[in-house]
Amino acid sequence: MARVKRAVNAQKKRRTLLATASGYRGQRSRLYRKAKEQVLHSMQYSYRDRRDRKGDFRQLWIQRINAGARANGLTYNRLIQGLKLAGVEVDRKILADLAVNDAAAFAAIVELARAAVAEQGTGGAASQAA
């Protein structure tokens, strides 16, 4: 059986890993063992943060919607409640974009929500009294 020499493969593996680690500070970009540890951690951070990014954006959208809603005299939770009651199916990403870039359209949506909440409030009180 022929002898297998792995030097070429090993060098390619190390070269690839060090290329991945380029841009890291100090030994983490130059020494194989340190670079390997850092690349492994970096991949874990990337994986985790790709999932965290979804929540971060949702949080940002909610803050923008809340600011726009309060500028129009309604709180975030009343706005969302009113939109659900009115049957408006616009997601938070679009609402946040409207709140930032198209204040008139956002104000119209807020009025829809306000009317739905007011109608539900009067309807609910009348049904409880009867």
UniProtKB/Swiss-Prot annotation:
UniProt KW keywords: Ribonucleoprotein, Ribosomal protein, RNA-binding, rRNA-binding
Question: Which HAMAP family is this protein grouped with?
Answer: Ribosomal_bL20
Q: Which family does it belong to?
A: Belongs to the bacterial ribosomal protein bL20 family.
> Which Pfam families is this protein grouped with?
Ribosomal_L20
> Which GO CC annotations does the UniProt entry carry?
ribonucleoprotein complex; ribosome
NCBIfam families attached to this UniProt entry: rplT_bact
Q: What does this protein do?
A: Binds directly to 23S ribosomal RNA and is necessary for the in vitro assembly process of the 50S ribosomal subunit. It is not involved in the protein synthesizing functions of that subunit.
What GO molecular-function term can you cite, just one?
Answer: rRNA binding
Instruction: Identify the gene encoding this protein.
Output: rplT
List GO BP terms, alphabetically. ribosomal large subunit assembly; translation
The identity of this protein, by name, is Large ribosomal subunit protein bL20
Q: Look up keyword S-adenosyl-L-methionine and say if it applies.
A: no
Source organism (scientific name): Salinispora arenicola (strain CNS-205)
